[in-house]
Amino acid sequence: AYPPAENLLVAENIPLDIVFEDETVIVVNKPAGMVVHPGHGNYSGTLVNGLIHHIENLPTNSNERPGLVHRIDKDTSGLLVIAKTEFAMANLSKQFFDRSTERVYYAIVWGSIEEDEGTIEGNIGRSFKNRLQMDVFPEGDFGKPAITHYKVLERLTYVTLVQCKLETGRTHQIRAHFKHIGHTLFNDERYGGNEILKGTTFTKYKQFVQNCFNVLPRQALHAKT
């Protein structure tokens, strides 16, 4: 079957983990593995397909993405706020544009981060070597400005649990920034966070990491707010 036209959205009865809902907004806990909106290669099974089944007449933005004012990566789990009215959409969009919203994530990264807290700054843009990745350009000659504040919550021998607060919202910001400082996200295949096993000869360590990958078979990133 041919995929539907890009602006033809089909309602699908997809179970949604609704955290909060009133007359103006709905907050959904998106599972890892779910794409937020239809696009090339993903024409069904997205969060938007489920939303338009749950709610009629969601407001649309210029990109024909009903209710959406922000998004998170397919393999990132966590909270998304969706506008149910035109007023809410305009208001929320302005808050994201003005950076007055608080966007907090939890991440597990490889290695032990020395500082208890810190800030990662550096422009983020499309990688010249791999177009599926974003790179950090600290000199500011390419990309767009990006700022990530982090705080260590717990050090766990091989990995560190961190809380990240975004001052900007660039594509793959947390993933690219932490790779840049040498602490790739746990099991982040696109940025090499799954390559820790390659060349490892310590069998017990190798088995431990493989067990961890089995428990969390995707990048360790969750949108808390």
Model-assigned labels for residue ranges:
Residues 1-129:
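RNA pseudouridine synthases
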Residues 3-6, 12-13, 110-111, 137-140, ...:
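Intrinsically disordered, low-complexity segments enriched in polar/charged residues with Gly/Pro
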Residues 4, 131, 203-207:
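Short, basic/low-complexity N-terminal boundary segments at the transition from targeting/disordered tails
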Residues 28, 176, 187:
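Active-site flanking residues adjacent to catalytic metal/cofactor-binding acidic residues
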Residues 62-94, 101-102, 106, 125-183, ...:
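The conserved catalytic core of RNA pseudouridine synthases
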Residues 73, 114, 142, 172, ...:
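Charge-rich, low-complexity amphipathic helices
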Residues 179-225:
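Phosphate/ribose-recognition catalytic cores of enzymes acting on nucleotide-derived substrates
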